[in-house]
Design a protein with these regions (language model features):
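Short Gly/Thr/Asp-enriched flexible loops that form oxyanion-binding sites at enzyme active sites
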Residues: 55-78
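Internal gly/pro-rich beta-alpha loop/helix module
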Residues: 82-154
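ATP/NTP phosphate-donor binding region
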Residues: 1-45
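Conserved active-site and cofactor/substrate-binding residues in soluble primary-metabolism enzymes
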Residues: 31-34, 38, 60, 64, ...
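Accessory alpha-helical/coil subdomains and C-terminal extensions
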Residues: 3-11, 124-200
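Short acidic/histidine-rich motifs immediately flanking catalytic phosphotransfer sites
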Residues: 48-52
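Hydrophobic helix-cap positions at the C-terminus of alpha-helices
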Residues: 11, 46, 72, 106-107
Length: 200
């Protein structure tokens, strides 16, 4: 949080924001239910009292977190934006500044929903997958077109499919959800010749 605050100050960023760090900063490939509970605590604490929330996330498991949030917050009181970068903020060719600035603008201006913002693209959080670690277009939605594109010159988002996304949404459960950290999940791929005994 300190490095981001310093960077925004150097860029003369004029938007008022509050920065908080997760309890434990990790490589996102080590993400667990405990980390998700920490993220949820931070979101619950700030969502209703702010214009929006931006979650900065490692790209390896960003899509999983975005999908989880889209299910838990199907109709949030404010926009929730998930973003990250393929290169560190300090790198000269980093995609972090573009993603960070556009995510903050999205949190302040977009209709309330859960989105992924990456490389100037607004993506449906529930359908997002990672496709590259070497290209700025690191994420895509295979079953949905982009919801919008960011115009850096005017600092605004141009919508493509937003009205359809926001129609007929169900109310979000108001109770604060927490994951059972004792649960373990096995990812098992079924292939020809594989039997159910392999999962025993």
């Amino acid at each position: 949080a300190d490095s981001i605050a310093q960077y925004l100050k150097l860029q003369n960023w004029h938007h008022q924001i509050t920065l908080e760090s997760a309890a434990q900063l990790i490589d996102s490939s080590a993400l667990s239910f405990s980390h998700w509970n920490n993220y949820l605590d931070l979101i619950y604490a700030h969502l209703e009292s702010n214009t929006g929330v931006v979650l900065l996330h490692g790209t390896d498991t960003l899509a999983y977190t975005a999908a989880m949030l889209s299910l838990l917050f199907s109709n949030p009181p404010a926009p929730i934006i998930v973003t990250g970068s393929n290169w560190p903020l300090a790198d000269s060719h980093s995609d972090a500044p573009t993603n960070l600035f556009s995510a903050i603008i999205a949190a302040q201006t977009l209709p309330a929903a859960v989105y992924v913002v990456f490389n100037g693209r607004l993506l449906l959080a529930s359908d997002c997958v990672k496709v590259s670690s070497q290209h700025p277009d690191a994420f895509m939605t295979p079953h949905c077109i982009d919801l919008g594109r960011y115009n850096a010159r005017s600092e605004c988002w141009n919508y493509i499919k937003l009205p359809n996304l926001l129609s007929n949404r169900q109310e979000t459960v108001s109770e604060k959800f927490r994951f059972n950290t004792s649960v373990r999940v096995l990812n098992f791929f079924l292939v020809p010749g594989g039997g159910d005994d392999l999962a025993d």
